[in-house]
Amino acid sequence: MRAGVVAPHRLLPGLVALRRFAAERFPPWATAPMAALLYAAPASLGRPGPLEAAGGALATFLGLLCLRIADDLEDLGHDRLFHPRRGLCFGRIDPARLRDASLALVTALVVLESTSMWRLGFFLGACAFYRAWYGSGRARVHAVVRPFLSNLVFPCAVLHGAGPAAWRASVPLALYAWLVAVAHEFAHNVRSVEEDRSFGPGYARALGTRGTAVLSAALFTGATVAALLLWQMLGRPPAFGTAIAAAGAGLGFFLARLLREPGSRHAGALYRAGILFGLTPALGLLLPR
């Protein structure tokens, strides 16, 4: 059996592992709509046909699932210490079988994406990047730089959805998606230096608690500027502008609380507000303009 090809008799156990993993770590009821939105919003700028749109949304969902699997398999040693109740950590999900399922998904994605050379190019490029990232790249990069590289999947997903006809118009949205994802990562990990030293990613050790909060706020501010650029490019549609203003005001409230009192107490609320803020431009693009 060639490397990278999953034997048929290993597929069924792999599918069981995949189903259990998705239910726990990538619940379709939440992730499928988000993946569809991540594809449909930039795709709306290029107006693809229904079949192409459905294939692109499915590919986005499966691609993000593969990335979630790769991330959890890479962090398995860490998670066994700090998240022992997860299925991968206590044996309910077999890592080898989950890896088999992931390889099968990658094969299916190559077939699915081959209908568009644009999308196939982005998919293969992402595979090459994340293979290098998980292989040795992540360990060589400073902790504060890691979120900027690990979250490149989001601007790539936007450009993947926009297609060759609309990628220029989608650049502000791609920048927005990237900055929000990175800001979200820092906001989620605003904690004390002691907490960070025990189980954190190293942001507080490098920047301090307040420094991590300030960087998160600066990135969210940059994302707001990118959203305003997109609004300008679209011809200033009122509904889109109103949605951005409302989401930005809500996020600003939680950012102010975090900056006033940095720490995990307010980081959770900002994390949830950041999700809504991150989805707003994508939802706004689907409104009548």
What is the predicted function of each stretch?
Residues 33-40, 89-92, 143-164, 204-209, ...:
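Small-residue-rich segments of transmembrane alpha-helices in multi-pass membrane proteins
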Residues 63-108, 179-227:
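Solvent-exposed interhelical
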Residues 35-44, 104-112, 123-131, 151-158, ...:
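Hydrophobic core of alpha-helical transmembrane segments in multi-pass integral membrane proteins
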Residues 11-23, 96-165, 256:
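Intramembrane alpha-helical segments
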Residues 37-70, 82, 121-122, 128, ...:
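Membrane-embedded alpha-helical segments that form the functional core of polytopic membrane enzymes
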Residues 5, 12-19, 128-131, 136-139, ...:
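Extended hydrophobic alpha-helices typical of membrane-associated regions
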Residues 40-58, 107-119, 154-175, 228-239, ...:
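Helix-coil boundary and interhelical linker segments in multi-pass alpha-helical membrane proteins
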Residues 51, 75, 136-142, 165-168, ...:
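Membrane-interface helix-boundary motifs at transmembrane edges
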